[in-house]
Amino acid sequence: MTWFRKPPAPATAGDLLFRAIETWQGEAPWGRVLDAGTGEHSLGWLVGRPTRAWTAVTGDPTRQQSLRTAFSTRMRPVDRVVDGDWADPGLLRGEVFDVVLADYLLGALDGFAPYFQDRLLSRLRPHVAGRLYLVGLEPYADPAPDEAGAIIVELARLRDAAILLAGDRCYREYPHTWVLRQLRQAGFQVVNTEVVPIVYSRRFIDGQLDVARRKLPRFRDPGVAAAMGQAIEALRGRAHAVHDRLGGLRVGADYVIEARPVGG
């Protein structure tokens, strides 16, 4: 089964999220780090940190191999990319890390372990010796409050329709207020939070619609696939026009949270 993960926010937003983590970490040693839901974006940032060792987990064997290849020259003998499912109690059993990063992991989890989201933070808790940094996306407001929001919601609906018609699962994002409650229930103390507004670019628009287009060959009905292809390009034109007129699509926000184990 394949899945879709939201592409990284525009560089300025992504930089701000990771910059917040770097600021909160300060002079504290990074030590052993776990990237609990890895990808090129998070791992590309992580390999630039002064870690003693890192472990990166992905639920996709294909991605595991591609990441090993992409980062082969930057991996030390102590670094590893692991294929695993957090619903598996044996995954990294007994291992503890100084820092754990969960970069958009909650949103992506539905593709690997549906209905496990409310247990994820408790599952990660035994692996966190020092700090947990969690990055997420606020769910889009629906109905949207303005024109930019309406375009983003329409993009998300069309993309998700294509994903479902291809037989795959969509991601599901959770608001930071829900995450804060779950962290406290899982035995964490929330230390810092930051919310970063998003300005979506043409690149984001095209990325979302290209995800939908790549699903078309797997539609069972060629007629539905053809109609979806036309809808994709029609929406691309309208979204580009709104983007250009507004100077970007200012919609929603990403958030980053620092938490530490209670009593840790």
Identify what each model region corresponds to.
Residues 131-159:
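Conserved class I S-adenosyl-L-methionine
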Residues 188-199:
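Conserved S-adenosyl-L-methionine
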Residues 169-187:
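Short alpha-helix
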Residues 32-92:
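Class I SAM-dependent methyltransferase SAM/SAH-binding core
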Residues 197-245:
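C-terminal helical/coil "lid" or tail adjacent to the Rossmann-like core of SAM-dependent
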Residues 90-100:
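A short acidic, Gly/Pro-enriched loop at the edge of an enzyme's catalytic core
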Residues 108-127, 134-136:
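A short, conserved alpha-helix within the catalytic core of class I
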Residues 1-30:
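Class I SAM-dependent methyltransferase Rossmann-like catalytic core
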